[in-house]
Amino acid sequence: MSRPDPFPMAFFSDFVITGTVGGADATSTPDEVTALLGDDFVESVDRGQRLRGYDLAEFAWQRLSSEDPWDGLYAMVQAHRLEVPLLMDDLDRELRRAGFPVTEVAPDGLGCRRFVREDSRVGLLVDEGTGAVLKISTPAWFGTGPRYAAPAWSREAGRSWVEHLVGLDPDGRERWAARRGPGAAEECARWWWFLLDSCLRRTPEGPDRVGSPWAGLALWLVGKCRTAGVLDRAEAALEVAGRVLLPPDEAVRACLDAMPVSRAEVATRHTTAYTRENLVAVNRSRRAKALALAAGAQLRRGVREPALRAEVAAWLELRPVLM
């Protein structure tokens, strides 16, 4: 089904497939978005948050203080503003034709169906009654798999378990897990993620986090989540860096070691098209960009080793053209 300009169907399908609007995505800086989309926008800025709108497209950034750079928060297409509704059936048909179908996940309980394209981390909210797409955003806060499943255990149980685990040595933790862990692999994966989430809720913020018993338990649980298939190597590194569980140099090494491709071979927007045939290369590039950003955030914490700083800087220089 075709749509009238200025918002043809390709505008929406491209955003779902690539996570970008005119080349700008949730990781683009304000200046990069301006260079790509122009200066015809409305914007609100305060000390810690910046929100910019280009008609349907919206970008948000955040920072801890006025001395910090703006970090991308999300990119969104506000489809509910359309005069002619965008129907999910039509968009789904176009995405399937292109070879990039979305997956429906549990509804939000507030009148919306939810769909996700996992590799681009794009989520869609759809009105249950009319079938009209309301919002398309990245990164999605919902998805498939154990990390997004409703927990089968209470928050009180999680708190009790991790408060017990934090006082045990590694052997004691292993014995406890062998006694208490679920038998089925899928339920076990959900359980390990639930324990990690429960632990992170108890882990102190600030400079006392690294090296604390809670950070040590969180690192152990990240390893268990990886063994259970909840996290792959790159996702584990992103958790460790993003949650500030290791000193900066060690966190950077974890990110760089998890890079799925070298700088010389990584796919860029200049060399590689978003096609089904290129999906492996595209997704490696996406993962490399996420790891580069996570490593870059560690530079603000004070990475000491010059070689690590140089390698991160080289990846960050590539970041604007990664997929």
Over which residues does each language-model region extend?
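Short helix/turn-capping signatures at newly exposed starts of structured segments
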Residues: 1-323
